A protein has these predicted regions:
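ATP-binding/phosphotransfer module of carbohydrate and carboxylate kinases, centering on a glycine-rich
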Residues: 1-44, 50-54, 59-125, 191, ...
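Short helix-capping/turn signature of helix-turn-helix
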Residues: 8-9, 187, 201
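General beta-strand structural signal in soluble alpha/beta enzymes
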Residues: 43-44, 170-175, 208
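Short, active-site-adjacent cap segments at secondary-structure transitions
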Residues: 49, 137-140, 178-181, 205, ...
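Short, acidic, Ser/Thr-enriched surface-loop or helix-capping motifs
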Residues: 83, 140, 209
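Glycine-rich phosphate-binding loop and adjoining helix at the ATP-binding site
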Residues: 88-194, 335-346
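Short secondary-structure boundary segments
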Residues: 134, 200-202, 251, 326-327
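Glycine-rich phosphate-binding loop of actin/hexokinase-like ATP-binding domains
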Residues: 191-249, 397, 401
Length: 407
């Protein structure tokens, strides 16, 4: 696909594009001309001379199309608008939807999306859709959550169809960790064809990308690394399993441990009745990075458990890179990165065959939201290219019918 090759290269000449795509130079010239006529591709100067005439460079036109990404969390929500290259151009955040019934929660998200689009001043006709990145389990095709979190009312609620109905835009539901992984790939955070992503917000999840595509499993609920069993005699988890890694390493677990260490909990002003998990965890993470020994001990313990998750992922999929993403990991990124890297170095099965590097997300707390928008773009590039090279020019600017939920 020509558009995707241009996107991946950032800037590329027609000759290079023909070589990388396997399409003849004559066909590339024709396709590029049509893509330029539709405003999707622009010329951006010339490359360095290699002895002959410098080659004209191409890139995607960032302002040709846009996509919205939403991190839909119990304690925090983030909305981003990205251009055709996946670069964020506008952002907003607000408290999560945990206290609200589903209808009100979705309506709140829709109002914030509309407000962001109005503030950004983009032509809504250029907005391809919305990627809704959230926790699971979920039925991605139906656009519904299959969990009683945060309340039983949310189970089976048509989150994506309802949001699409309000916005009048296609809405794609996907796992937050999977979205974060593909977002990192698109933004060039990793230079390897296969890598894993460990994502931590209020819970822990994972995503694996192979050759630019997400590993989906049978129902797109795979790589739930927070629900691997790390203690056969451990307590019950909300997922129905016992001894899950999340019970020992996620923000709720860390907060519980801090409260049990009464001097630390009191010193940080932690309240057992506080439902804002992200804010409470953020206080512990900030204290750990500031050198508080008790707080650092808790964060390092959580990080060692995530190291087990990273070792499991690398051994299962033979990965050479693990990305740490999500708002909770961003809060104490250097500590988590250092500890997880050491665990992987010591324990990965193929450590004598190749090193495994652990890096932090380039998108920080917004990784899942940006990834949600990227998933929309990823699904649309082929549609845009087909429409541009087979349709009359009058159709330019009209988004094609797309997969996903729409009104």
């Amino acid at each position: 696909m020509v558009l995707n090759h241009i996107r991946a290269a950032r800037t590329i000449s027609r000759i290079e594009l023909a070589a990388e795509s396997g399409v003849t130079p004559a066909t590339i010239t024709q396709v590029v001309r049509e893509l330029m006529d539709h405003g999707l591709v622009v010329e951006v100067g010339r490359g360095a001379s290699t002895g002959g005439k410098p080659r004209t460079l191409l890139q995607l036109n960032p302002r040709a199309r846009y996509a919205v990404g939403v991190l839909f969390e119990r304690n925090t929500c983030v909305v981003v608008l990205v251009d055709l290259t996946g670069r964020p151009v506008a952002r907003t955040s607000f408290p999560g939807t945990a206290p609200l019934p589903p209808g009100q929660g979705v309506a709140l998200v829709a109002s914030r999306v509309n407000a962001l689009l109005d503030t950004a001043g983009v032509d809504r006709g250029k907005v391809l859709g919305v990627g809704l990145a959230t926790y699971g389990p979920q039925d991605r095709r139906a656009g519904v959550l299959l969990t009683h979190q945060p309340t039983p009312e949310w189970f089976g609620y048509p989150v994506a169809p309802r949001l699409s109905e309000i916005l009048g835009l296609p809405v794609l539901l996907d796992n937050d960790a999977a979205a974060a992984a593909i977002g990192e790939y698109w933004l060039g955070a990793v230079d390897t064809p296969a890598f894993g992503c460990i994502y931590m917000a209020s819970g822990i999840g994972g995503g694996v990308v192979v050759d630019g595509e997400l590993y989906r499993g049978s129902s797109s609920n795979g790589v739930e690394i927070g629900h691997i069993t790390v203690d056969l005699d451990g307590g019950p988890c909300g997922c129905g399993n016992y001894g899950c890694l999340g019970n020992y390493a996620d923000p709720t677990a860390v907060i519980k441990q801090a409260l049990e260490a009464s001097p630390l909990g009191a010193r940080l002003g932690l309240d057992p009745g506080d439902t804002d998990v992200m804010a409470a965890f953020g206080r512990i993470a900030t204290a750990a990075q500031a050198g508080d020994p008790a707080a650092r001990t808790l964060i390092e313990r959580s990080a060692r458990h995530l190291g087990t998750a990273a070792v499991t992922m690398t051994s299962l999929f033979d990965l050479d890179t693990i990305v740490l993403a999500g708002p909770s990991l961003a809060a104490a990124g250097p500590i988590y990165q250092s500890v997880v890297q050491e665990e992987v170095r010591r324990r990965t099965f193929a450590r004598r065959a190749h090193p495994v590097r652990v890096v932090t997300s380039v998108s920080g707390s917004d990784a899942a939201a940006i990834g949600g928008a990227v998933l929309v773009l990823q699904g649309e590039l082929a549609v845009l290219e087909l429409a541009s090279t087979t349709s009359p020019r009058e159709s330019a600017g009209k988004p094609a019918e797309r997969a996903g939920h729409r009104r």
